[in-house]
Amino acid sequence: MLYFSTNNKAPLVNFKDATINGQAPDKGLYFPKNIPVLSPGFIKNIADYSDVAIAYEIIKPYVGDKIHAGMLKKIVEETINFPIPLVPINDTISSLELYHGPTLAFKDVGARFMSRCLGFFVKNQPKKVTVLVATSGDTGGAVANGFYDVPNVEVIILYPSGKVSTVQEKQLTTLGKNIHALEVNGSFDDCQQMVKDIFARAADFTNLFLTSANSINVARWLPQQFYYFFAYKQWADKNNPPVIAVPSGNFGNICAGILAHASGLPIKHFIAACNANDVVPNFFETDIYEPKKAVATISNAMDVGNPSNFVRILEIFNQQTGDLKKLVSAKSVSDDETRATLKKVKDEYNYLLDPHGAVGYNALEKYLQQHPAQKGIVVETAHPVKFFDVVEPIIGSPVAIPQIIQDQLKLKKQSELMENNPEALRDFLMKL
């Protein structure tokens, strides 16, 4: 498989080079030259396959011959060595729980897959490989966990000061060793821009080999397709495929779902469920894509004012927004609606959503009210305990804290304060 840049001003590369480079040299995102089409027999008999076999079948054409079959199977096994259950909430809505991995967030899958691919690719790299990642919350913890103690790899995580939850901050600031947490005086978009600015000047860092672990990296983005196949495998009514609502911030997760659909996975409709950061919902209404400064919400991992992966979604549809709107809709949900939904679902169905899942549930519920013949899935992206400081006042009772989180909360934070300035990041990298 070859990959081109969405800006169309960079050479084609293979999976290995796309993974190592992160972003294309023309600042575009890598995108597969061809979208593999899965056989109808595979889809029809999906219930007969193990999750590992499904994931291997999906990712194999994207990797090509850059990782041999035995190693790729091992990477897949280590990536999804935890359950991803589809849990009914009520008669019409089920929750796809993506939070049973080591950091209790959906990003564990992409981070684990990418860290193992990159570790395989850079074993003999003479320069020190430096992974730069901006996080609005869960990416940082998942990347830190995935790359912790990987030889010859340093990980630099930028996160907006005061804009991630207590648990999220502990997960990305307490490991030490090859994991460096930089607490930036700014927003997630500022952090992401600092990373992009550094990549644009990669030639300045002669002693480092820079790459990214954000969902712009194909090795983090592509394995997110797995969830959607696992959901369909567990979906009872194969003759009536689900509507899937995806809490959306940087749009990597829903983009992977749409890519899975393009490969042949039966999905009736996708809903991009956004918070007050409504750039994409506005685009669906006006056909004008106008990035904005991110605003802070209680679903902080989606506080993104210029979603990087939206360009990939447009690429899947060959820039045909009419075709896009047939399969996908976008909905903005306020914090008040999020709180009300979270409380209602807990009170009525005894199911506890996190704030991001509540955004997804709200958008899905509204869609199903207009399409009563359909049933749907909300993609639940994180365990509610990761946002206990938001959730507990809403439901009026404590969230049960898993032992793994109790242990993390006792650890000492290790971070370095940094101004919102690419030069400050450049100076930090020069000292590595």
Residue spans for each PLM region:
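PLP-dependent amino-acid enzyme catalytic core
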Residues: M1-L432
